[in-house]
Amino acid sequence: MTLKTTGRLSRRELLRALSLCAAGTSLAPFLSGCRDSRQTPESLEKLGRKRDALDGKPKFLIVIGAAGGASIVDSFLAVRQSESANAAALNTFPDAQVQGVADSPFRAVKYSNTRLGSINIPVNTDQLAFVKKHASEMLVATSVGTSVNHGIAQKRSLTGNGAWRGRTLQEAVALQWGSGMPLPNVNMGTGGYAERGTDDSLPLSCFGEPVVNPSLWPLGLDGSRGIAGAPPKDVIALARSTRDALDQKSIFGRTFQDSSALKRWNEQRGVQQPKLEALDLITKLNVLPDLPSIPLSKYGLESSADGARLREVFPGFFTDPVQGQAALAFLLLKYRVSVSVTLGPDFNVAVGGPNGIANPPLAFDISHNDHRGGQAFMWARILSTVDSLITLLKAEPFDADSGESMWDRTLIYVATEFGRTRPRPSGATEFGSGHDLNNGFLLLSPMVKGNTVLGGVDPNTTLTYGFDARTGERQPGKVTSNEPDIFSGVLTAMGADLSGSGLPDASAFKRT
């Protein structure tokens, strides 16, 4: 493969590129600009993209990785004890803790305890307000996965277990709607959620741009700003021009002047880098305030125009990774930097929140020690983030003509990884759980068929059962894997062009 024809480096080209980049690896996070200019309409169509892609009117995907296994029967498909013939031995709840929502198939769990496993913090959560507020734009699809390994299950929740040549949902969205975006696919996830797909035919711009620290990352999006005593821009431009001229005349430059890797590197360094700097992303994406301890103005920097609002919505943005990721995700979409962003908790403890712990060890996987408390705490964390993002996106106009908000063109996919085992010691209210293939996923968007559960739950086993992805018809007893259906459902709801993909018809996901 060559970079020119596929947007991908061959092994030999990669080795050459690495040697070229050795002195400038700090540029990598923001030098992966769009490669679509190298693609012909025919090659784009072969990649599964329409020739008349909606370049001027993008749609957006937010993936939230619920690391550790977010149990759907501890949230929207919870089972009451009175409904099950095996209530004492399974993960069923006292009837009063499972609240119904008028004219909705969803349920909401209310939970209270004085501690979270062995962690001495109270857990008091109630999902009812969230469900009431968002039910009309919520869809829950039951699922059976194919792995209970964290990393593998996380990645398969993004690829549908290789449903479309191994590409991830984020990559498919970047290909479809990311043309012209500086960084179409930004990934702040962890583990398998952060992995790229295996479709090597995609342009490089479709693959995720990793971001480790969302609060500090924007400060690296300019080669000279923020450096005390840095030369003015015209001097830097002159130095860069001189450097490029010398490189071109060097023995190395003349020897490898026809190398596609060197041509690409020169384009990144000489064309894409100045373009990215001209976008002023170092300001637009910067949530940090100008304080004595963070003297932005001293170094010629300033906070984003949206900074104060985001710091109010996400007060823990600097110490709580999820809040910081959510703040950056909103800005990446608002300023049309990206069409796909990925975020979510990792397995590390985060200090903060009203009780001192923002993220418990192992995130949802703390359910090994305290299933009910862990699920309640982490679902509250996820749903709070989702609610804040939706509120921000609803208030943000998409454009001046259509009357649409950003939310009208956005889909949030909560990738739950896998489920949890259902048995418990007879009548126990505190117990641990293991990993289980059986679960469900949550989608939220004006584009999905809202107020809908695809599939259902058998109350006597508390296992979910499947559905027909085309018609939405429930199929009790169906417990076979349906990962491609979920993958196709997300893209179908968004209106992606799936011609040539071989994906199943998932019309049941889409609002009509």
Q: Where are the predicted features?
A:
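Ligand-binding pockets and gating/stacking loops
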Residues: 2-512
